[in-house]
Amino acid sequence: MAEEQAYHVNKGLECIKSLKASPPDLSTIKDALESWREGLSPSGRATPNPDTSEGDHQNINQSCSPAIGSDKVDMSPEDNLGFREITCNDSEAGLGGVLDKGSNSQVQRYYVYSHGGEEIEGLEDADSLVVQANPPVTDTFNGGEDGSDDSDVDSGPDDPGRDPLYDRGSAAGNDVSRSTDVEKLEGDDIQEVLNSQKSKGGRFQGGKILRVPEIPDVKNSRPSAQSIKKGTDGNSVLSGTVTECSSISGATQAVPESRWESSERNASVGSVPKSARSAKTIQGLTQESGTIASLTQPKENDSEFEYEDDLFTEMQEIRASIAKIHDDNKTILSKLDSLLLLKGEIDTIKKQISKQNISISTIEGHLSSIMIAIPGFGKDIKDPTSEVELNPDLRPIISRDSGRALAEVLKKPAVDRSQKSGIKVNSGSKGQLLKDLQLKPVDKQASSAIEFVPSDHESSRSVIRSIIKSSKLNIDHKDYLLDLLNDVKGSKDLKEFHKMLTAILAKQP
């Protein structure tokens, strides 16, 4: 049904635009209608209009020329447009015809429906009976936007036994003049038309076309305002306006911002509604009914205002206390962060101290295993080493039992330390080490750390091979020298080979 309505609305608007663009002459229209009516005789054949035969008579559901004649029906097989000529005495203007495409050419009874769905009996068979609405000439090309609200055809009762195809054909079979029959509906009329369509089973009734109202200008419209005058328990009086909210969604109503400033710190607001848990508690009537729920302001006593002021003050104090606690917590957290840093530094110091303790323990272990040759005291008189002469150059380093190793390295025994202080001791004498403990002089004929002296030993040959391999000579020279070394026999030849090798290496850069 909605598609059919949209189709007819679009067709009507197209006709209106075309007529506005090129309006025909009224005299020409009158002449055409008179000539068309004169061409129809009671006994003649109804000839379709040639101007509309190509476009308007292609479908059964589109408007056609009326048929006026006697009761006899004549069949015209030559007509290629699907029309069968009839003559009928009871033809009336304003009725819509239904084409019966049955194969039987005999006369039979059928029904003709008007735009309102009224059933008309008594007419005989006419496959292409078309009844014209026959509007006045002055109203034929009337504009669609300024069309009359009183339609010529009203929606009649719906026949349950009526074929939907016939109903659709009668609704669509309007002429151009019928498309211009537009009624402007707004507000409650739209709702009534929709309800009537629903109650009639959703069928489209011809004769009225809905017209969507224009969108109102929101910028120029002003919301309704109510004056508010509420005391604030002080000398000043708050005056302003509250605007009715047009929105029905949400649980919080809009409150305008106050333009007045109060010197008081605390002030109660009476225009704000109480909080709601859901939108149903404050949702008013829908906008379709045209009414909006208005805000109600509860009446409160002065004691209640004072109680609310006290609660507000206490809430402010609680919020200030919570903010102070929050700041204190931040300070504590910063201190804890610094403590964590100090803990890390302390752990590092402890590790360093433990390393130093390990080093000191290692040094003490080495010192405990060393016997330092220093003069000592507390020797026994009977000890043969007690008469060893003192060396003035020796000084005690660590307070240990000194002088224990002197008897082992000195020729003379230690001096008796138990002598009286009056006895003079020869301090100029120096102790001498034993020959067995003295180092032997360096032998220049043998290999030492000072110089390498080749011998007829395999170790000497290994040393010479290492010298050749580690040199910067070419590989061929190295191989040649190694072959010569293998051929050398005896210590004398080996010494000569070593001298030659030393001279060659000295010449290398």
UniProtKB/Swiss-Prot annotation:
Gene Ontology biological process:
DNA-templated transcription; viral genome replication
Q: Where is this region: Disordered?
A: 33-84, 131-236, 256-281
Tell me the Pfam families matching this sequence: Paramyx_P_V_C, Paramyxo_P_V_N
Please give the superkingdom of this protein's source. Answer: Viruses
Q: Which UniProt keywords apply?
A: Phosphoprotein, Viral RNA replication
Which residue ranges does the record annotate as region Interaction with the nucleocapsid (N-RNA)?
459-509
What's the protein called, per UniProt? Phosphoprotein
The taxonomy runs: Viruses, Riboviria, Orthornavirae, Negarnaviricota, Haploviricotina
